[in-house]
C-alpha cells in the first residue's frame, strides 16, 4: 500500500479504469462460484486494506464528478442546476446501464475489496497501461456534444433588474423594438414608468403640487396605480411631516381616478391593522396621520375615523391613547365641522379614561394624562393650531370630491400583485384609451420633464417630418408662485449689493418683464417702509429708476398718491419712512410735484395721520432744499396747481386753518402770500359791506327827496301858469315881441336858481339821513357788542380761531405723542419679553447641557467602576486558576516522587 500511495496523480484514474475492466470481464464470464482459496483470501484481508480500497473508490468517483462539472461549465449563460444530460459531455456508463445494454443478462458477481488488494502492486501499472490501450483501440470515439449558441441576456429579467441604463439609451432600445405587444417593450416601458413615478413623488411639495400632478398624468396611472400607491405610502413613511402634501396629491388623483384613491386607502387600512396587531407604535402613528389627512381631503369617510377611535379607546393603553390623540390632532378640525356629535362622544370617552386613571391604581403614564389634557385644550381652542386643510393644498372643489366609504373590516386585499409587471395583450388599445382620458383632463399640452433622461434628443427635434402645430392651453397660476419667486430674487439681489448703483445694475440685468415693473416699484417702496429707520439706500435706488425710464417715474407717482389715500392705515414708523422717501424724491425732482395736488389742508379733508405725514414731508423738504428754495417752489406760478389744496384760497376758514397749521410746524414763511390774500379779501369784503350800506342809505334818502321836489315843482308850475295866463290876457290886443323875449330869459334864470337851491337842500337832507342811518347802525353794533352772545370783533375772532387751532393742534400732537409713547412702551415690553424668553431658553439650554454633562460623568463613573470590578474579577479568576495550576503541578510532582 505504501508503494501505491507513492504513485503519480494518475493512479486513482488508472485504478478506476482497471476496476471497470474487471467488471466488464466479470459481466462477460458466466457466474461461477468462488473457490475456497478466494474465499480464504477475502477472509484474510485486513480491515485496513478494505478501508484503503474504499478510499480509492471514493476518490475516483469524486474525480469523475469534478470532470463532469468542468465539462458542464463550458456552456455559458446556463446555470448548473438547469443543465441537462444532452448539453453536457457524455458521461461514463454506469454498471446498471451496461447491464441493461448487454444482450444476455448474466448475474453480476460482486467484487470483493480483498481480491483487488491481493494483486501485486508492482505489475499493476503495466497491466493498466496495456488494458487502457486495448480499451482505447476497441472503443469508438464518442461524438462531441453540440454547443448551444449563446443567447443575449435580457437585462430586465435579472434578479436586480440589471445594471443602470441611462434614460436616453433605454429610450433608444425601446425605439428599436418595433412590436409594442412584445414582452420586452412592455417591460422596458414598465421600468421607465416606475422610475419616473418614484422621482416625481419624491419631489412633490406644496408649491409644485399642480405641476407634479400634471407630470404624473402623462404616464398611464391606470396601469401603474400599484406603483403609484406604493411610492406615495413609502414617501409618507419616510417624511410624516409632509402627510398633508401627499394627501393632497392623492385627493387630486382620486378626483379623476377614484379606483387609485380606493386602492391607496385600502392599503393604508391593511397596513394599519398589521402594525396595530404587532404593537408597532411608530408605523401606526405614521399611517394614522396619513389616514387623517385623507379624511380632511374628503377621500375617506368620517366613519373610518370613528371606527379607529373606538378601536383605540375600547381598551385604553398608553400606546393606544397616544395614537388616538395624534389622530385627533390631525383630523379633529374636520370632525368638528362635519360630525360634532361624534367628536363630543370621543372626548367624553377620553374624559372618562382620565377620571378612571385618577381613581384606579393601574393608572396611565403621567405623560399620557398630560396629552389628554392638552387635547382638551386644543378642542377648546377649536383646533386653531391644527387646521384641516391649509390654503395652498385646498385644490379640489367640493362637487369634484369622491369619498370612499371603506371601513376596517372591508379592507382585506391590498392587491400587491399590481406592483409587479404583467404582460398586457391589448397594450396599444389600452394606451390609446388612456391617451383620450388624459386629453380630456389636462388637454394636449405636454409637459417636458426636468430630468435629462426625459428630454427629447436633438435628432428627434431635427427630424425631416414636420408636425402640425398643436394647440396649447394657457395655464393660469393662481398660487402666486412666480410672484413670490420674483420678490425673493429682487430682495436677495438688493441685500447682496454694496451700494444702490450696484443694486440698480443687477436689477436691470434681470430683464424684468413689463408686467412685473409695477411689482418691482411696489416692492422697493415696501422695503423702504419696513425698515426700522429710513435708509438713504432705497431713496437713491428709487431716484435712479425714476431717472432711467418714464414708466418707473409714473409707477412711483401713482404709489405716492395711493399712499396718501390710505395713510390712516399705516403705523407711525412706516409713515415716517415713506414721508422721508417722498421728500427725497421731490427735492431731487425725481418725481413730479403734482402728487401734492391730492392733499387738502382743511379741517374736513384731513386726519391726524395725514397732517403728521404732511408735516414730515415739509420738514424734510426744508432740510433738503432750504426755506428760500422751497418758498420759491411754492410760489412758482407753473406749480400753482400742485399747492391748491395745501394753501386753499377759496374759503377764508380753510385758508386760516392752513396758515395756523404751517405756523404751528414752524413753516409760517410759506404762508405769506396766503396771509396777504386773506387780508385783501377781508378789506375787499369790508369795502363791499360799506358800499352796500351806502347804497341802501342813498336809496332811502333819494326816495324822500324825490317826493319833496315833486311837490314844489307842482306849485311853481301852477303859479307860473297863472301869471302867464294873466299877462297873456292883458296883452292880447297888442303883444309886444321884444318884451316877451326878455321875460322868457328871466324866467329861465329864475328856474335854474330855484333848482340849484332845491338840489342843495336835498343834499343836506340826504346827508342828514345818511348820518342818522350810520348812527343807528353804530347803535345796533354797540348793542350787539354789549351782548355776551354776539360779541365778535374781527381781531378777537382771529385770535379765537388761532387759539382753537392751537388747542386742536396741541391735542393732536398730544395724541400722537401718546400713541408713540404707547407704541414705544409696547415695543419695549415686547423686547423685554423676548429678552426674558431668550434668557430663559439660554438657561434651559445651559441646564440641559449641565444635565447631559452630568449624565456623561455618571456613565463614565459607572463605566470606570464596572471596568474596575471587571479587572478585579479577572484578577481573582487568574489567581484562582494560578492556584489550581500550582496545586495540580504539586500533585504531579508528588506522584512522580
Curated annotation (Swiss-Prot):
Residues 194-382 form the MIF4G domain. Residues 1-155, 444-472, 689-897 are annotated as: Disordered. It comes from the Eukaryota. Residues 485-601 form the MI domain. Residues 447-466 have a biased composition (Acidic residues). Disruption phenotype: RNAi-mediated knockdown results in germline masculinization and the accumulation of unspliced mRNAs in the cytoplasm. Expressed in germ cells, oocytes, and sperm cells. Keywords: mRNA processing, mRNA splicing, Nucleus. Its main location: nucleus. One of its GO terms (cellular component) is nucleus. One of its GO terms (molecular function) is RNA binding. One of its GO terms (biological process) is germ-line stem cell division. Belongs to the CWC22 family. Required for pre-mRNA splicing and for exon-junction complex (EJC) assembly. Hinders EIF4A3 from non-specifically binding RNA and escorts it to the splicing machinery to promote EJC assembly on mature mRNAs. Through its role in EJC assembly, required for nonsense-mediated mRNA decay. Plays a role in the nuclear retention of unspliced mRNAs. Plays a role in sex determination. Required for early embryogenesis and tissue differentiation. This is Pre-mRNA-splicing factor CWC22 homolog. The lineage of its organism: Eukaryota, Metazoa, Ecdysozoa, Nematoda, Chromadorea.
Amino acid at each position: 500500500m505504501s508503494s501505491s500511495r507513492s504513485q503519480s496523480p494518475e493512479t486513482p484514474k488508472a485504478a478506476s479504469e482497471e476496476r471497470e475492466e474487471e467488471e466488464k470481464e466479470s459481466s462477460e464470464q458466466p457466474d461461477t462460484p468462488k473457490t475456497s482459496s478466494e474465499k480464504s483470501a477475502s477472509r484474510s484481508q485486513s480491515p485496513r486494506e478494505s478501508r484503503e480500497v474504499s478510499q480509492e473508490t471514493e476518490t475516483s468517483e469524486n474525480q469523475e464528478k469534478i470532470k463532469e462539472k468542468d465539462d458542464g461549465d463550458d456552456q455559458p449563460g446556463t446555470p448548473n442546476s438547469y443543465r441537462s444530460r444532452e448539453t453536457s459531455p457524455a458521461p461514463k456508463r454506469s454498471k446498471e446501464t451496461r447491464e441493461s445494454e448487454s444482450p444476455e443478462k448474466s448475474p453480476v458477481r460482486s467484487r470483493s475489496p480483498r481480491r483487488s488488494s491481493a494483486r501485486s502492486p508492482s505489475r499493476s501499472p503495466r497491466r493498466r497501461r496495456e488494458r487502457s490501450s486495448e480499451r482505447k483501440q476497441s472503443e469508438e470515439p464518442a461524438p462531441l456534444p453540440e454547443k448551444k449558441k449563446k443567447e443575449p441576456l435580457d437585462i430586465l429579467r435579472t434578479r436586480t433588474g440589471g445594471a443602470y441604463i441611462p434614460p436616453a439609451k433605454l429610450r433608444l432600445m425601446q425605439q428599436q423594438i418595433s412590436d409594442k405587444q412584445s414582452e420586452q417593450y412592455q417591460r422596458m416601458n414598465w421600468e421607465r414608468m416606475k422610475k419616473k413615478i418614484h422621482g416625481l413623488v419624491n419631489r412633490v411639495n406644496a408649491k409644485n403640487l399642480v405641476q407634479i400632478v400634471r407630470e404624473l398624468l402623462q404616464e398611464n396611472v391606470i396601469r401603474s396605480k400599484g406603483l403609484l400607491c406604493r411610492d406615495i405610502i413609502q414617501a409618507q413613511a419616510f417624511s410624516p411631516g409632509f402627510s398633508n402634501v401627499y394627501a393632497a396629491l392623492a385627493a387630486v388623483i382620486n378626483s379623476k381616478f377614484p379606483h387609485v384613491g380606493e386602492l391607496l386607502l385600502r392599503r393604508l387600512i391593511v397596513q394599519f391593522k398589521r402594525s396595530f396587531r404587532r404593537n408597532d407604535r411608530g408605523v401606526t402613528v405614521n399611517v394614522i396621520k396619513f389616514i387623517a389627512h385623507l379624511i380632511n381631503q374628503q377621500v375617506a369617510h368620517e366613519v373610518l375615523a370613528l371606527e379607529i377611535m373606538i378601536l383605540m379607546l375600547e381598551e385604553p393603553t398608553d400606546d393606544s391613547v397616544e395614537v388616538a390623540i395624534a389622530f385627533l390632532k390631525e383630523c379633529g378640525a374636520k370632525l368638528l365641522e362635519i360630525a360634532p356629535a361624534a367628536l363630543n362622544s370621543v372626548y367624553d370617552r377620553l374624559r372618562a379614561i382620565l377620571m378612571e386613571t385618577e381613581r384606579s391604581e393601574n393608572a396611565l403614564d403621567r405623560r399620557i394624562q398630560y396629552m389628554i389634557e392638552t387635547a382638551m385644550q386644543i378642542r377648546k381652542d377649536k383646533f386653531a393650531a391644527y387646521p384641516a386643510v391649509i390654503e395652498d393644498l385646498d385644490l379640489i372643489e367640493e362637487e369634484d370630491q369622491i369619498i370612499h366609504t371603506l371601513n376596517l373590516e372591508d379592507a382585506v386585499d391590498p392587491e400587491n400583485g399590481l406592483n409587479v409587471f404583467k404582460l398586457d395583450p391589448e397594450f396599444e388599445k389600452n394606451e390609446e384609451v388612456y391617451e383620450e382620458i388624459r386629453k380630456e383632463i389636462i388637454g394636449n399640452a405636454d409637459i417636458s420633464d426636468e430630468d435629462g433622461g426625459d428630454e427629447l434628443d436633438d435628432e428627434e427635434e431635427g427630424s425631416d417630418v414636420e408636425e402640425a402645430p398643436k394647440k396649447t392651453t394657457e395655464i393660469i397660476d393662481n398660487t402666486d408662485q412666480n410672484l413670490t419667486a420674483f420678490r425673493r430674487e429682487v430682495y436677495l439681489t438688493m441685500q447682496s449689493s454694496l451700494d444702490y448703483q450696484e443694486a440698480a445694475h443687477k436689477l436691470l440685468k434681470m430683464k424684468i418683464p413689463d408686467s412685473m415693473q409695477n411689482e418691482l416699484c411696489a416692492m422697493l417702496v415696501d422695503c423702504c417702509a419696513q425698515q426700522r429707520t429710513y435708509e438713504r439706500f432705497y431713496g437713491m435706488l428709487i431716484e435712479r429708476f425714476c431717472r432711467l425710464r418714464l414708466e418707473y417715474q409714473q409707477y412711483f407717482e401713482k404709489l405716492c398718491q395711493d399712499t396718501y389715500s390710505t395713510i390712516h392705515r399705516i403705523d407711525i414708523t412706516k409713515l415716517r419712512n415713506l414721508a422721508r422717501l417722498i421728500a427725497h424724491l421731490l427735492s431731487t425732482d425725481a418725481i413730479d410735484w403734482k402728487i401734492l395736488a391730492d392733499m387738502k389742508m382743511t379741517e374736513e379733508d384731513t386726519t391726524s395721520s395725514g397732517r403728521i405725514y404732511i408735516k414730515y414731508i415739509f420738514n424734510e423738504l426744508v432740510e433738503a432744499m432750504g426755506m428760500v428754495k422751497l418758498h420759491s417752489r411754492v410760489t412758482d406760478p407753473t406749480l400753482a396747481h400742485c399747492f391748491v389744496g395745501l394753501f386753499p384760497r377759496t374759503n377764508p376758514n380753510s385758508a386760516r386753518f392752513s396758515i395756523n397749521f404751517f405756523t404751528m410746524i414752524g413753516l409760517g414763511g410759506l404762508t405769506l402770500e396766503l396771509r396777504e390774500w386773506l387780508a385783501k379779501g377781508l378789506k375787499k369784503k369790508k369795502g363791499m359791506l360799506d358800499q352796500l350800506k351806502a347804497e341802501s342809505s342813498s336809496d332811502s334818502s333819494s326816495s324822500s327827496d324825490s317826493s319833496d321836489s315833486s311837490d314844489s315843482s307842482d306849485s311853481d308850475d301852477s303859479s307860473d301858469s297863472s301869471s302867464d295866463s294873466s299877462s297873456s290876457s292883458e296883452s292880447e290886443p297888442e303883444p309886444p315881441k321884444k318884451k316877451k323875449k326878455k321875460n322868457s330869459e328871466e324866467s329861465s334864470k329864475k328856474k335854474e336858481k330855484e333848482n340849484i337851491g332845491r338840489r342843495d337842500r336835498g343834499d343836506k337832507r340826504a346827508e342828514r339821513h345818511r348820518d342818522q342811518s350810520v348812527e343807528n347802525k353804530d347803535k345796533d353794533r354797540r348793542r350787539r357788542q354789549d351782548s355776551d352772545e354776539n360779541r365778535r370783533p374781527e381781531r378777537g375772532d382771529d385770535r379765537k380761531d388761532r387759539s382753537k387751532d392751537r388747542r386742536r393742534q396741541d391735542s393732536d400732537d398730544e395724541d400722537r405723542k401718546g400713541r408713540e409713547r404707547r407704541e414705544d412702551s409696547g415695543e419695549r415690553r415686547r423686547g423685554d419679553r423676548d429678552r426674558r424668553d431668550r434668557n430663559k431658553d439660554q438657561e434651559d439650554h445651559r441646564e440641559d447641557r449641565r444635565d447631559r454633562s452630568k449624565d456623561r460623568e455618571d456613565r463614565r463613573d459607572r463605566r470606570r467602576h464596572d471596568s474596575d470590578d471587571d479587572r478585579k474579577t479577572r484578577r481573582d479568576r487568574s489567581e484562582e486558576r494560578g492556584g489550581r495550576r500550582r496545586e495540580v503541578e504539586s500533585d504531579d510532582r508528588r506522584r512522580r516522587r
